[in-house]
Every structure is written in structure tokens, then in C-alpha cells.
């Protein structure tokens, strides 16, 4: 599996799953652009890529802004080339029970986690169509399929992500562009490490494999979907959740 010569764009790449994806695509030979919402985050991405021998850059991108998406893509195209692999990973949470949820908690999550797919995917399709090759990979969540109390906004956005993935896959398949999603379960991150022991044990009790996933395990699936080995896979949502949810 080689991505040599391909330019890959990974949003939300300063830590966790996004960082692991950026490093995996770089390991496979891609030139990687990772984005963050702040200059310090973009600098961290650039340093991480360099430290791991990956060619690429860290850039500031607000996926909720049409202007930011347009400016960032123009910069990438001018300096690094057309991104033919795009990983929509950036996302936020604003958890609350629906009865208490404020409008901005709903709309911020939907705008960042779902509307951003529309903005970024639409913006890169022309270049992929011209190249007659492309990979769009959307990072969803097990919550999009099974739901989670206090996360109606997040669950709705992630469920929408899966529908978007399937519909777009049907639109662009004839151009050798594949569109897939990866739906992680609970992953070992700073947030899950801070859970109280009792809560952590209860969580592990729901997972047949009896452990949290690693960000690198998500990244390996993304690396496969980005490769020519997955050229006949499109419109799929790949669950990586340790068996927590089976469909």
C-alpha cells in the first residue's frame, strides 16, 4: 500500500485520531497537510510531521467557514498540489440533555461536524474529478448508530455523516472517487484517561474486546481506505469499536 506522490488533507490533526491518521498517511508516502483551528495547533502539527519524517505542513483551518476553506485550499494547491485524499476528521462536542440544550450548542456541533463535509468535499471534488482519482474519508462515531444520552446534536451530525457518505459515493463513483466513513467506538485519549475508575470499568463492560481502541487502529483503517487496495470499497461505514455496537 503506497500513497507516494499523493497529497492528503487531514482536518483536526493536532492530536488524537487526527494526528494518528496524518502520521499513517505520511508513513504510506503521502504529502500530508494537517489542519487545526489555531496557529499553535498548526505549528504543533508541522513539528510532529517533521519529527516523524513526513513531508507536509500544518495549517490553520476553520471548517465552519466557507472563506477559510477556500483560502486554505488555494494555499495547498499553490504550494503543495491538489489534495486527492481528504479526511474529514475535525469535530467538536457540546453535550447537554435536549431539554436544556441551547441553540448554539446544537448549531455549533451540526455546523462543524456535518456542514463542514459539504463545504470541504464540494471544494475538492473538481480536482479529484480532473485527476479521475480521489478518496474522501469521513470520521464518524459509534454514537451515530447507537445514540448517546446528552448528545442529540453529536449523534444527529454523525448519523448525517453516514448518509452523506453513501449519497456522495453514488454521485462520484463513475469518476474513480471513493467516499467512505470510519466509525470509531471509545478510543484511548486524554479524555477517556481522565474518567473515574468506576465509569471506566462500566464502559469497558460494554465492549466485547474488553479494552479501549487506539488512535493508531483507526488510522490503519483510514490508510487502507485511502489506498488503491480499497478501490472497490465505496459508500461503506467501517465500524472500529471493539464490538460495542454490531449491525
Swiss-Prot record:
Function in brief: Catalyzes the NADPH-dependent reduction of beta-ketoacyl-ACP substrates to beta-hydroxyacyl-ACP products, the first reductive step in the elongation cycle of fatty acid biosynthesis.
User: Its Enzyme Commission number?
Assistant: 1.1.1.100
Binding residue positions for NADP(+): 12-15, 37, 62-63, 89, 154-158, 187
Residues of the active site are 154 (proton acceptor)
What Gene Ontology molecular function terms does this protein carry?
3-oxoacyl-[acyl-carrier-protein] reductase (NADPH) activity; NAD binding; NADP binding; oxidoreductase activity, acting on the CH-OH group of donors, NAD or NADP as acceptor
The main enzyme category here is oxidoreductase
Name of the gene encoding the protein in the UniProt record? fabG
Keywords, ordered alphabetically = Fatty acid biosynthesis, Fatty acid metabolism, Lipid biosynthesis, Lipid metabolism, NADP, Oxidoreductase
Provide the reaction this enzyme catalyses.
a (3R)-hydroxyacyl-[ACP] + NADP(+) = a 3-oxoacyl-[ACP] + NADPH + H(+)
Name the Pfam families on file.
adh_short_C2
Q: Does the keyword NAD apply?
A: no
Q: How does it assemble?
A: Homotetramer.
Query: Taxonomic lineage of this organism?
Result: Bacteria, Pseudomonadati, Pseudomonadota, Gammaproteobacteria, Pseudomonadales
Q: InterPro entries per the record?
A: 3oxo_ACP_reduc, NAD(P)-bd_dom_sf, Sc_DH/Rdtase_CS, SDR, SDR_fam
**Pathway the protein takes part in:** Lipid metabolism; fatty acid biosynthesis
Family under the similarity heading:
Belongs to the short-chain dehydrogenases/reductases (SDR) family.
Sites binding substrate sit at 141
The Gene Ontology biological process annotation of the record reads:
fatty acid elongation
Q: What is this protein called?
A: 3-oxoacyl-[acyl-carrier-protein] reductase FabG
Matching CDD domains, A to Z? Answer: BKR_SDR_c
Amino acid at each position: 500500500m503506497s500513497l507516494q506522490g499523493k497529497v492528503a488533507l487531514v482536518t483536526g490533526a493536532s492530536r488524537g485520531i487526527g494526528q494518528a491518521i496524518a502520521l499513517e498517511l505520511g508513513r504510506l508516502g503521502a504529502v500530508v497537510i494537517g489542519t487545526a483551528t489555531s496557529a499553535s495547533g498548526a505549528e504543533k502539527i508541522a513539528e510532529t510531521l517533521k519529527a516523524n519524517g513526513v513531508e507536509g505542513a500544518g495549517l490553520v483551518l476553520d471548517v465552519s467557514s466557507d472563506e477559510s476553506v477556500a483560502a486554505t485550499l488555494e494555499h495547498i494547491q499553490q504550494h503543495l498540489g491538489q489534495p486527492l485524499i481528504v479526511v474529514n476528521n475535525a469535530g467538536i462536542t457540546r453535550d447537554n440533555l435536549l431539554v436544556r440544550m441551547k441553540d448554539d450548542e446544537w448549531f455549533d456541533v451540526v455546523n462543524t461536524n456535518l456542514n463542514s463535509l459539504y463545504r470541504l468535499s464540494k471544494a475538492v471534488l473538481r480536482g479529484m474529478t480532473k485527476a479521475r482519482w480521489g478518496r474522501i474519508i469521513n470520521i464518524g462515531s459509534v454514537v451515530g448508530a447507537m445514540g448517546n444520552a446528552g448528545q442529540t446534536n453529536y449523534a444527529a451530525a454523525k448519523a448525517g455523516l453516514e448518509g452523506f457518505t453513501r449519497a456522495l459515493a453514488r454521485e462520484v463513483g463513475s469518476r474513480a472517487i471513493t467516499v467512505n466513513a470510519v466509525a470509531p467506538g471509545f478510543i484511548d485519549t486524554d479524555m477517556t484517561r481522565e474518567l473515574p475508575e468506576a465509569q471506566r470499568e462500566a464502559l469497558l463492560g460494554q465492549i466485547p474486546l474488553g479494552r479501549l481502541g487506539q488512535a493508531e487502529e483507526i488510522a490503519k483503517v483510514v490508510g487502507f481506505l485511502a489506498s488503491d487496495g480499497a478501490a472497490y470499497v465505496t459508500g461503506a461505514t467501517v465500524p472500529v469499536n471493539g464490538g460495542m455496537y454490531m449491525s
